[in-house]
Regions:
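N-terminal secretory signal peptides that target proteins for export/translocation
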Residues: 1-4
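Bacterial N-terminal signal peptides
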Residues: 7-17
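Glycan-processing catalytic domains of CAZymes
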Residues: 22-423
Length: 423
């Protein structure tokens, strides 16, 4: 009762903002990075289309997102009106990741809430056809990181990549980013051990979603190219987005024993845990059954272990047969328990999935507190889905507290903070 009352006060009296200093981009030590999709477009942003909000024009039967973002702080030139959608009889709006003003605003929020930086998703399957679109968002990120003092690094998502060409596509695009866009020359590009961090997500996953390669030697050769065989200016600290069961080669991981050497070759292991558990009890079991042995294995391999945590999950609009609010957020308890357990198990760094992933209901950006604040048409999740009164920035606040915990600024506590505040 007391906790709900305190949260209700927060809705009316947001805390004063503490402006955090620039993040040290030279090391991954104690960092908490958040995935950033940056894939939303609308017709008025120059793309001439709606992307990721829906299949075509947004409507109840075309929506592919769950959470409705809180747009109250966005200016008129950041809002895209949605034809046929209303909120209380007034026009409904969405945003575009192509708008530099909006991306800058997102990074300003990260600074206000004390988040370290982002892993920007870049999709291998779209590079040949849509590289210019990805470049627009990347340039927005580079400018926003500079303004806010947050770090950023590239994270390639290989889902749907051509098994025959994805490796060369990765190499060519990385050389393009280094030579033409000068990403690794940016003062806020995330580095570690003197090299830029590069993440490649999806190798070794065996979930039926088309993650090449199937041959572990191809994967190992690719890692070695990025770490040591390319020209010096392209060398990286290699982060691998792996199956959650990378350590045992079971469940969502390919079972060929040769994959163990692939994972051992990575500098940073980032297992994908999203959707692998859905209750607090399961989170606790996951710590003992998976994270604790993972930490030991990574230490034996002299690797950085970077588990992934997520606030909840729902993709009813994206997968129409999926149930609504599939993995409830439990007012932040689910999110907090994962981060606390990871810290107590020995993890030194963390990834949060994701900043803006409203598609699968994992976003931590500001979203509406009440269903009535979302469009009247269609299914939408709001922060009151679990019956709690929460401010729209609740998950940014919690992410900030998680970051402070990993920085060593606060002691790990299994209890959810009553009033997490912007730093």
């Amino acid at each position: 009762m007391r906790l709900n009352a305190l949260r209700a006060i927060l809705l009316l009296c947001p805390a004063a903002v503490y402006v955090a200093g620039a993040v040290d981009a030279s090391t991954l030590d104690n960092k908490v990075l958040v995935g950033y999709q940056g894939w939303f477009t609308c017709p008025s942003d120059g793309s001439q289309r709606w992307t990721h909000w829906s299949r075509g024009v947004p409507a109840p039967d075309t929506l592919t997102v769950e959470l409705y973002p809180d747009l109250s702080e966005l200016d008129a030139d950041e809002r895209c009106e949605v034809p046929g959608m209303t909120i209380g009889g007034k026009p409904a709006y969405l945003f575009s990741s192509r708008n530099p003003k909006t991306v800058s605003r997102h990074f300003r929020w990260m600074k206000e809430y004390g988040l370290d930086g982002v892993l920007l998703q870049r999709f291998v399957g779209e590079i040949r056809r849509k590289r210019a679109d990805g470049d627009v968002v990347l340039k927005n990120i580079m400018a926003a990181a500079n303004e806010s003092g947050r770090t950023f690094a590239i994270e390639y998502d290989i889902s749907g990549g051509n098994p025959e060409t994805f490796g060369q596509t990765l190499k060519d695009d990385w050389m393009y980013l280094v030579d033409e866009l000068k990403v690794t020359s940016h003062p806020n590009y995330q580095r570690h051990n003197g090299k830029p961090v590069l993440s490649i997500w999806g190798m070794g996953l065996n979930d039926g979603n088309g993650h090449p390669p199937t041959d572990p030697q191809v994967a190992k050769d690719l890692i070695e190219w990025f770490k040591s065989k390319a020209a010096d200016q392209y060398h990286v600290t290699y982060m691998g987005g792996t199956p959650s069961r990378w350590g045992t080669l079971t469940r969502d991981a390919r079972v060929d024993p040769a994959w163990a050497a692939v994972y051992a070759a990575m500098d940073v292991v980032q297992p994908w845990n999203v959707g692998r558990y859905g209750t607090l009890e399961a989170v606790d079991h996951w710590k003992e059954d998976v994270i604790v042995p993972d930490v030991k294995l990574a230490a034996a391999n002299r690797q950085i272990y970077m588990p992934v945590v997520f606030p909840g999950f729902s993709w009813h609009n994206l997968k129409r047969n999926a149930r609504e609010n599939q993995i409830p957020r439990l007012s932040g308890e689910f999110f907090w328990r994962q981060a606390y357990n990871a810290k107590m198990a020995g993890a030194k760094v963390l990834k949060i999935a994701m900043f803006d992933e409203v598609d699968e209901g994992t976003a931590i950006l500001k979203v509406v507190s009440h269903r009535k604040e979302a469009p009247d048409q269609g299914f939408w999740l709001a922060l009151d889905a679990d019956g709690a009164e929460l401010p729209s920035d609740w998950y940014l606040r919690l992410a900030g507290e998680i970051t402070r915990m990993f920085h060593g600024e606060i002691k790990p506590d299994p209890k959810l903070p009553a009033i997490p505040r912007p730093r």
